[in-house]
Amino acid sequence: MKSKLQFKWLAGFALVLMSGVAIAADLPRQMVEIYRIAPGQHVNFLKLIAMYDAANVEAGLPPRQLYVHADGASWDFLIIQSDDDWTPAQRTKVAEALKRMGAPTGAKFFLEIRKFMAEHTDTVATGPTTAAQWLKQLE
């Protein structure tokens, strides 16, 4: 129970980490992912994420924002990435890059990444913004 509460708190905290302000009517969607890694699998997890980041960059998309645990709760890595839809061209470029790299995709990715995780959670949020900017949506 304590672990689940910590993950929920961390997801909220992640939103604070995303600095900058967007116009309230045009907030981007962000995927916030929190990972607790299986013992001894930290390097392998980061290598897999680095491969997917390289595919993003090759397709003209930004790499994920990675935060590494320094103190406090029981998580290891926090990742923030865009949840906005990619164009068909971007999807094709990412898929081609991943295939060329030999990276697992689809069901194989689902199984591969879970080799490294003890626990994870993800959520979609809008932002970054401020309370004042967000409240303007109510006008």
How would you label these PLM feature ranges?
Residues A24-R29, V57-E58:
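Short, low-complexity N-terminal intrinsically disordered segments enriched in polar/charged residues
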Residues R36-K47:
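Short, surface-exposed ligand-recognition loops at beta-strand->loop->(often short) alpha-helix junctions
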Residues W75-L78, W134:
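Short, solvent-exposed polar/charged micro-motifs at secondary-structure junctions
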Residues M51-L66, S82-T130, L135-E139:
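An amphipathic, aromatic/His-enriched active-site/gating alpha helix that lines ligand/cofactor pockets
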Residues P28-R36, L78-I80:
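Active-site-flanking beta-strand signature of metal-NTP-handling nucleotidyl enzymes
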Residues M18-A24:
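Sec/Tat signal peptide C-region and signal peptidase I cleavage site
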Residues Y67-S74:
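A short beta-turn/loop motif at secondary-structure boundaries
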Residues K2-F13:
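Bacterial N-terminal signal peptides that target proteins for export
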